[in-house]
Amino acid sequence: MYGIEYTTALTFLISFLLLRYMLKSVVKMMDFIVYKFLLVILILSPYIKAQNYGINLPITGSMDTAYANSTQSETFLTSTLCLYYPTEAATEISDNSWKDTLSQLFLMKGWPTGSVYFKEYANIAAFSIDPQLYCDYNVVLMKYDASLQMDMSELADLILNEWLCNPMDITLYYYQQTDETNKWISMGSSCTIKVCPLNTQTLGIGCLTTNANTFEEIATAEKLAITDVVDGVNHKLDVTTATCTIRNCKKLGPRENVAIIQVGGSDVIDITADPTTTPQTERMMRVNWKKWWQVFYTVVDYVNQIISAMSKRSRSLNSAAFYYRV
């Protein structure tokens, strides 16, 4: 009896040791296969390029770009402020140290030296082609010009709001705007936009799809054009593509780290395309026009009240994304 029990125990022990050995062998083999597979992927990954394809893609190309906060290397700074002004301001002031003077005045308002950046632009037309806003807070000074009301209004609409944009191939496709937030934005040295609305049979309504001269012209030789057409209707477009880039864009909402100060003019420019809404926005302000020194003094005096109507963010508007991002 005892011999049978010893034999059973010995058989069980041998089976256990054999199973343990087999499991260890399997684990070692799997480790070898996995590590070898990862090594092959690591070696081949620099030489492999993949592309995702989709159908009916939504509007996804952003005009915003993430950027490293310019104050990160300076621990004593908490925020940056960019003040954009036209060239004529510097020309009128004609003082090589005027920026240093303003920096000292901003310091007295709580903005440390080095946290305020002065950005010059040639004129509204030039700024419309390539607006770039990089600071935590951005304040744009625009001198009122009756002949440039439309340019000022569209520039304000562009920089005071966030947009998602996709390229448009107007030679192959018809396009329609889905709702009031959907616009076509054109930028370039000269943008002339013509449209031909289509019926359900894709025949032109009041125009011939084969003759661009019969299209309705809705923008002529503009630097920046935000086009709004009848929603839900297909349109054939004719655009001066040699000097202009057009994108299908959707307005997401306010870009709250940007404010515009209109210098002069009787009323603040209306930037709202929808006639049923109140045009005024807290970040669209106006100061009286006297001299540029007076304008800058006013900005310094009210800078903290202006900032209180804004929200800090670490994203920037870079119009280069408008031209190149898909």
From Swiss-Prot:
Region (CNP motif) residue spans: 165-167
Principal location: virion
Cellular compartments annotated: Virion; Host endoplasmic reticulum lumen
Region (GPR motif): 253-255
Disulfide bonds: C82-C135, C165-C249, C191-C244, C196-C207
Residues of the signal peptide: 1-50
Binding site for Ca(2+) 2: Q177, D228, V229, D231, D301
Residues that bind Ca(2+) 1: D95, G206, T214, E216
Region (LVD motif): 237-239
GO molecular function: metal ion binding
One annotated Gene Ontology cellular component of this protein: T=13 icosahedral viral capsid
Record Pfam families: VP7
HAMAP family: Rota_VP7, Rota_VP7_A
Cited function: Calcium-binding protein that interacts with rotavirus cell receptors once the initial attachment by VP4 has been achieved. Rotavirus attachment and entry into the host cell probably involves multiple sequential contacts between the outer capsid proteins VP4 and VP7, and the cell receptors. Following entry into the host cell, low intracellular or intravesicular Ca(2+) concentration probably causes the calcium-stabilized VP7 trimers to dissociate from the virion. This step is probably necessary for the membrane-disrupting entry step and the release of VP4, which is locked onto the virion by VP7.
Assembly, per entry: Homotrimer; disulfide-linked. 2 Ca(2+) ions bound at each subunit interface in the trimer hold the trimer together. Interacts with the intermediate capsid protein VP6. Interacts with the outer capsid protein VP5*.
Protein name as annotated: Outer capsid glycoprotein VP7
